[in-house]
Amino acid sequence: HVMHLGAAMQMKPWLLAVIFDLPKPQTPFAQDNLLMTTSEDLSKNVVGIETPQEHFGVMDSFSLDEQMVMLRAVLKRTPEQKEKDFEKLMRAYLKGDAAEIANLDAQITGGMLPAPLWKKMRSKLLEERNVVMAQRSLMKANEQSTFVAVGASHLAGETGLIAAFRQAGFKLTPLNMR
């Protein structure tokens, strides 16, 4: 990744960790942007499940020391490691295997962070947010036909969105991703 030093110096360590943990993009457009623009092109109403403050504020709950641990861990990873891990995640995603994605999250991110920090990160980034995302998504889904797009890590587990929708009585059908 290439970034102007002045810009990097203005960013919080957690944001730098997120940016530098990504492999080289396959396309200039992120999946979120592709889904949003496609929906807008089809004149579909696009609504965020979280506010930007909720989305980004989660990381502000981590101390500066914790953010630096995250950044150092990410910077130790080689581009080859990032690409290999990304490919594993993509294979699990394309198979529709949410449990495997959760396992890979634990291996990859959990494997590079101290256990207490990984536990806090999982709780703050996934479990707590999943509850809110599920409540808001279910409200919409009970009102009208709804397409919900979230990061794949939000799908699996007891607090994942798949479990929440099934517990609410919805029948879920995976999309054919091939």
Which stretches of residues belong to each language-model region?
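C-terminal soluble interaction/assembly domains
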Residues: K119-R178
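Structured, acidic catalytic/metal-binding patches in enzyme active sites
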Residues: H1-M121, L125
